[in-house]
Swiss-Prot record, chains A, B:
Record note on quaternary structure: Homodimer and heterodimers.
Tissues/organs with expression: Expressed in the stele of the root.
The protein's name in its UniProt record: CASP-like protein 1C1
Record's keyword terms, sorted: Cell membrane, Membrane, Transmembrane, Transmembrane helix
Native species: Arabidopsis thaliana (Mouse-ear cress)
Amino acid sequence: MVKLTKRIGGLVLRLAAFGAALAALIVMITSRERASFLAISLEAKYTDMAAFKYFVIANAVVSVYSFLVLFLPKESLLWKFVVVLDLVMTMLLTSSLSAALAVAQVGKKGNANAGWLPICGQVPKFCDQITGALIAGFVALVLYVLLLLYSLHAVVDPFLLQKS
Amino acid sequence: MVKLTKRIGGLVLRLAAFGAALAALIVMITSRERASFLAISLEAKYTDMAAFKYFVIANAVVSVYSFLVLFLPKESLLWKFVVVLDLVMTMLLTSSLSAALAVAQVGKKGNANAGWLPICGQVPKFCDQITGALIAGFVALVLYVLLLLYSLHAVVDPFLLQKS
């Protein structure tokens, strides 16, 4: 019975991670706002920033991976390799979220030392939607860290909870 | 004999990771250049960018952790917990390197969509030293990923190399 609940627990975490990564992807891709600035009409979209494009690619990869792993048979030896792939996905989410956050922070506050003005004053809705995508990306990351700790706990017992 | 070589291998990886994280920290902290721009004298330093400050803090944490773990007794049960801490350090290095890279990329190329001009034209030596710090940070990250795979391999055998 315990094994069954553990297995279902793992699948639920993976399903939630799939949902969060997909949401982050969709919210980021659909973030766009038109604004006029000194009589010039501008449109802000996620493709304007390399870090946001990286965020989209990373969450797309994680979404596909999370979906495929749901169909891996229980007895498959590949589950041993899934631990390493979970690690890779966790690093990909960590990296893309951090890069997008760093650039979003500059977009929100600007950087006086570098002479970069903030942009969120002109395109507030765009910035709010980017924030939403980053939150969804953070949820996906937390779920993947839980998945990793869950896999590590099953094999390494790092918190010494199992009676030896 | 195999166990001894494995143990020494682990310690050498940790020592190298300690050296790389410390180098990244020192190179980033000492990066500074004075430049004059439209008769204004400016000094570029790592504290100008939040992402670079984050990079310094992360590599400082990893350096201290890597140094302390070197003194952990072989038989200690804490080694089981070190796998989780190695994961945390790997994520910290991934995150801080990605954030610093995202901002450095904007510093090097600017971003026309956001109206941000590149800065490396005015402070080329500063940018070169930042690049050096990011390379050292990347080496520390690669070493930590190897350490993680090494720990996972010892307990999970994800590449199914051990004869069952």
